[in-house]
Structure formats: structure tokens, C-alpha cells
Design a protein with these regions (language model features):
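Conserved acidic donor-binding segment of nucleotide-sugar-dependent glycosyltransferases
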Residues: 336-338, 342-349, 358-364, 379
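Nucleotide-activated donor-binding/catalytic signature segment of Leloir-type glycosyltransferases, i.e.
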Residues: 261-282
Length: 411
């Protein structure tokens, strides 16, 4: 047995500012003593990074992509095949494209040389494609965490996802809704899907429901359709028309930024609404602490994309800022109407405006929601507890005891 067994995290892009849950998970594993290698299939184009990124001790490897022409790619595969006896069988029996095959071969060489005993990917897209191929090449097991777009989007090919589920040693997903969806749709292939919520390092999210709050309605997320921010702008126009004192700030960047700014201008909301662009996690936390409420008016997008369970809801509830959201996928598992938050129908700007007004004007309600929300987060979304569950799965799937001191992986 390898005296220092290692787990490989296979990610499409690392680091990625919007995927704080991956960073939190990696840091929790490291605190428990798990040795990790991080493999990134694409180079990040983010220009802002979270301060916690500097705490990651695990080595990060960029996996080389396909060569500039087919001949060079074939030559690279031939070179890898000298060290990977199963490679040509996988190439001939796979319908994967050349880039995925070459990255899988490169990854395979690395994980064998570095004593990797198991691979874990986040999102059932290219990271899982490459991990699955590498598993076939090396015989090293793989698992993945399914989130949202990777299982709901209209571009998801059912047979391809079914094969990823069936061939994996285990699948984690981030909401009970997702578990039921996958089991209903993929039957036996998804029978072993396990719910483990994305978690937070609660030491970094001190609870402060009675801080110096502004009449600020905050939205945080990528500027894409499924976040529903256009309805938050419509709700802002309704609140302004009623003379409610407030400001609305939306933090994040994305493909709809120009459209949302045009909507701000068209509704003449310049004095009430600001699109802030992307921010670091520390700056986002400060915004959450200042805000009276967090609005996440999520919707089912036209391409069937939707949120799984937005991390920003967990962060806001942990910090003591009450939330408003919609009954999309796993959100009702954390936002229980009138108990841990307020719920409105998706695409209903009037209901959203009314809910915002309630929280802007009812301090007692805000305090009650905040207290209940924090209790729920502590009970179900502590990253140290949830990462220990993940390590226990890694131990089971690899056949190697990965437990360390403290909570490290045992159940």
C-alpha cells in the first residue's frame, strides 16, 4: 500500500472564482490531512481570486491540451502508449474526441506516477469525461459531484450521462431534488447517487444578524438567465414607485451584463440600482453583512438550465442576512418559507417586491429568519462534517483507509 495515498481532484478550470464550494472542500480535506493533487483541464481566465486560495497546499497541474494538428496529437498519444498498455484499446473503443483522449492519457501518466488511488471530478461534463477515460486507461477508480447545469441543461446527452453514472465508483450530488431527479431519470445507473450538501467553513462566516444593516437589497451571482436578476430589477422599479427607501446592488459578471444595464437605464433605476461586477469572496461577505436581505430570484432558463442550490444562499444565512428565493430545484431544502427565509414564485416581480418590502421594514422577522437559518446551516452545511462524508466515500471506493485524526473520514 502506498504509505501516502493521494486523491486527484479533476476540474475543468482551477481556480474559478464562482466555484467557492470547490475551494472550501479542498481546504477541508487538507485540514483533515488528506493528500491531494489538483488537475486543471483549462487555464483560468479569472482576474480576481479569493484570499483563501493562498491557503491551498496541494500541488496544481495543468493538463496539456491537444496539439496544433492531428499528427502531433497522434505522436503524443503514441508516446503515452509506451507507458500505458491499455491506452490504444480505450482509443479504439471510445467515441471521445482527440482532445479528451490526449488529456486523459496525460492525466493517466501523472496519476500513476504520483500514486493516485482515486479521482474525483466536479460537474459531470468534461472533467468527468476525462476522469472516466483515465479510469479506463489505468484501472484507477473515479467519482464525481453532479451540480445543476451538468444534469439539467438541454445539451446534456442522456446516454452519455448514463454511462458516466454507471461507470463511476460513486456519484455525489448537492440536493435531495437532484438525487430524486437522477434516480427517476437514470434508474439503475443512478441507484447509488448520494446526497452531500456543499458546505461552508463556518469559522469564516461569523453570525451577526444585528450588525449595522443598510436598506440594501443584494443580489450575487453570474449574470445569466437562471439567476433571474431581470425580475429583481422589475421588483426594484415597483419598490421605487411605492416610495420605499432602498438600494439594490447586483454583484457578478456574465453574458447578460449589457442587457441588465440596458434594463436599468430603461427603467430609470440609476439612482437605486448598481451592477457592481465581479468581486472577491471577502468583498462579497462584506456586502452580505451590510445588506438587509439577499434576493436570489432563480428561474428555470429556456435552455432548461437551473441552479442546484446556490452557495450564496448558504453564505448569507450563515452570516445572518435573511434571504428571498424561489422554489427551484433544491432551494426549498434550505429556504423554508417563513422559517428560514421567504419564498416567492419564479418570474413574479410583484411578489418579489412585496417580500423585499417585508424584510426592509420588519426587523423582528429578519432576526427570526436569521436565527433559524443559521441553525439549519450549522446542522447540515458544515464543510468539515460534509467533507468527512466525502472522504469516507473515497475510502470505500478506493479500498484504502483515508482516515486521519479528528473527523478525518471515518463514519
Amino acid at each position: 500500500m502506498n504509505p501516502n495515498p493521494r486523491i486527484a481532484y479533476v476540474l475543468k478550470v482551477y481556480p474559478r472564482t464562482s466555484q467557492t464550494f470547490v475551494l472550501s472542500e479542498i481546504l477541508a480535506h487538507e485540514r483533515a490531512g488528506l493528500e491531494l493533487d489538483i488537475f486543471s483541464l483549462r487555464r483560468t481566465d479569472d482576474t480576481r481570486f479569493h484570499a483563501e486560495l493562498a491557503q491551498v497546499q496541494s500541488p496544481v497541474f495543468q493538463v496539456a491540451r491537444a496539439r496544433s494538428n492531428a499528427t502531433l496529437t497522434l505522436n503524443a498519444l503514441r508516446e503515452h502508449a509506451q507507458h500505458l498498455p491499455r491506452l490504444w484499446d480505450v482509443v479504439h473503443n471510445s467515441q471521445a474526441n482527440a482532445e479528451d483522449l490526449l488529456q486523459a492519457a496525460t492525466l493517466s501518466r501523472a496519476i500513476v506516477e504520483r500514486g493516485i488511488i482515486h479521482m474525483h471530478a466536479h460537474f459531470g461534463t468534461v472533467a468527468t469525461v476525462v476522469a472516466r477515460l483515465a479510469s479506463k486507461i489505468t484501472g484507477i477508480s473515479y467519482s464525481f459531484t453532479a451540480h445543476a447545469k451538468d444534469i439539467f441543461h438541454e445539451n446534456v446527452v442522456e446516454e452519455v450521462l448514463r454511462n458516466k453514472l454507471a461507470d463511476s465508483s460513486g456519484v455525489i450530488t448537492v440536493s435531495r431534488f437532484n438525487v430524486n431527479y437522477l434516480r427517476d431519470k437514470y434508474a439503475e445507473a443512478a441507484a447509488g447517487v448520494k446526497l452531500i450538501y456543499n458546505g461552508l467553513d463556518l469559522d469564516k462566516f461569523p453570525f451577526d444578524p444585528d450588525g449595522d444593516k443598510l436598506p440594501l437589497v443584494l443580489g450575487v451571482g453570474r449574470l445569466v438567465e437562471k439567476k433571474g436578476f431581470s425580475y429583481l430589477l422589475d421588483a426594484s422599479a415597483l419598490m421605487r414607485a411605492k416610495g420605499i427607501p432602498f438600494r439594490c446592488e447586483i454583484v457578478g459578471g456574465g453574458e447578460l451584463e449589457a442587457d441588465l444595464q440596458e434594463q436599468v437605464n430603461k427603467l430609470d433605476l440609476g439612482g437605486h440600482v448598481t451592477l457592481c461586477g465581479a468581486m472577491s469572496q471577502s468583498d462579497v461577505k462584506q456586502k452580505i453583512r451590510q445588506a438587509r436581505l439577499l434576493a436570489a430570484p432563480c428561474v428555470h432558463a429556456e435552455n432548461n438550465d437551473r441552479d442546484g442550490l446556490p452557495t450564496i444562499l448558504l453564505e448569507s444565512m450563515a452570516l445572518g442576512t435573511p434571504c428571498i428565493s424561489t422554489p427551484v430545484t433544491g432551494i426549498p431544502e434550505v429556504l423554508k418559507p417563513g422559517e428560514t427565509g421567504l419564498m416567492v414564485a419564479e418570474r413574479d416581480a410583484n411578489a418579489l417586491a412585496d417580500a423585499c418590502e417585508r424584510l426592509l421594514t420588519d426587523q423582528q422577522l429578519c432576526t427570526e429568519l436569521a436565527l433559524n437559518g443559521r441553525r439549519l446551516i450549522e446542522d447540515q452545511f458544515d464543510i468539515n462534517k460534509n467533507a468527512a462524508e466525502i472522504r469516507a466515500l473515497f475510502s470505500s471506493m478506493s479500498g484504502v483507509d483515508l482516515s486521519r485524526g479528528g473527523d478525518g473520514g471515518g463514519t
